[in-house]
Structures are given as C-alpha cells and as structure tokens.
Amino acid sequence: MTRKIIAVIPASGVGSRMQAGLPKQYLKLQNKTILEHTLEIFLAHPDIEKIVVAVAETDPFYPQVALLDSPKIQIVFGGETRAHSVFNALQVIEDDSWVLVHDAARPCLKRSDLDKLLQIDDKQGAILATPAIDTMKRADGNKIMRTEDRSTLWHALTPQFFPTRLLKQALISAFKKNLTVTDEASAMEFSGYQPRLIAGRSDNLKITRPEDLALAEFYLTQNTEKKI
C-alpha cells in the first residue's frame, strides 16, 4: 500500500544568533527567502502530498511569502518551542500517515538524500545524519573535560521521518515528563525507539549564524549551475 507522506516545516523561530532584523527563514538568498528555497524542495517531490508549515501567531512576515499560498501548503500556528510547533502541525495530519520534519533554515537539502530517507519502511523511523569527522571534546564551561570517541558520534540533520501516530505519542509522553526534546528523534528515543541513521550530505547545513549565509548561497549556486 502506498504511504501518505506529509512534510512539516517548523518556521516559528526568531533566529536570534543571526543578529538580523527579521527571523532567519525570511532572509534572502538568490532573491528568494530561505523558507521558499526549503519549501520548493518538498513541493517538487511527487511523493509528498502536503506540507504543513508552523509559523508564529504574531509573525507579520509569512503573509508576504507568495509560495505559502500553494494549495499543497497548510499553515498552522507554532508553540513555545520547536517541539510544540511540530506537535501543533501533527494535529492536522492523519495518524495513519508518515511525517517528514525538516528545519526551515536548511535550504540546501538534495533530492537524492530525501529519496534515500523516503525508502525507509521501519516504524522506528529514520533521520539524515553525518558521521562526526572532527575531534569531539566534552566540556565543563570553556574547559575540556575529555575527548570523546567520535567513531560512534553522528551529527543529526533533517528531514527526520516517522509514522505520524508514533511521533505524536512520543511527543505527548516527553511533554508529560518535562523532557527536553531537541529533535523528533530524541522524542522517539525517550519512548524506547531506535531510529535509523541515514548518511546524508554535509552541505545540508542549517543556517544559524551570519557566516552560514555565504556558504548556503554557494551551495545553492552549485545546484543551479548543475541544472543548466
């Protein structure tokens, strides 16, 4: 049976580390907002039925994003944290579907990585990730406590892909226990699941600091040139 796949884009953050005058998802790269670049990836995929975008209720910028008028996109209001925004989005998604959660500020996702993730049919779900290649230090403040074994460490990326019903239940359980949910996989882990790691590309960066903009623009330019 063909699965119903829905994408969720939490886009209600303020992006304080960007030191910009507006939330980072509305900053522009190549004459489009970061959010538009991100949405285009999912709008172009034939297996994704709908995209639910969670925005802040007081956000004055999202009505100016023309792409959000697409009939394939539904807007919901986010919550106090990213996890609550994702949970709010799940309320308008059928429980028997699968959900792809992707950061609004990751505009450089490659279709090949997305396709690899969508091939997974394991109820424990899966996430894109990259193996740690730098030496990893555990710190106490700004002092090194020890060096960690990087051979077992991965950088979690998005999208993260789960059965909607199970992710919803995992988030509810985490909220009740006041657990800190940093990504969807962490909520699933708290509920005893072991999501799979799917090796993704390192250029699927999350724009977080001002210097990330130039790098993202470079990656997007490379993508454009390859299509010509």
From Swiss-Prot:
Catalyzes the formation of 4-diphosphocytidyl-2-C-methyl-D-erythritol from CTP and 2-C-methyl-D-erythritol 4-phosphate (MEP). CDD domains: CDP-ME_synthetase (cd02516). Its EC number is 2.7.7.60. Keywords: Isoprene biosynthesis, Nucleotidyltransferase, Transferase. The record marks R17, K24 as: Transition state stabilizer. Pathway: Isoprenoid biosynthesis; isopentenyl diphosphate biosynthesis via DXP pathway; isopentenyl diphosphate from 1-deoxy-D-xylulose 5-phosphate: step 2/6. GO terms for molecular function: 2-C-methyl-D-erythritol 4-phosphate cytidylyltransferase activity. Pfam families: IspD. It is an enzyme of class 2 (transferase). The gene is ispD. It catalyses: 2-C-methyl-D-erythritol 4-phosphate + CTP + H(+) = 4-CDP-2-C-methyl-D-erythritol + diphosphate. The keyword Amino-acid biosynthesis does not apply. It comes from the Bacteria. This is 2-C-methyl-D-erythritol 4-phosphate cytidylyltransferase.
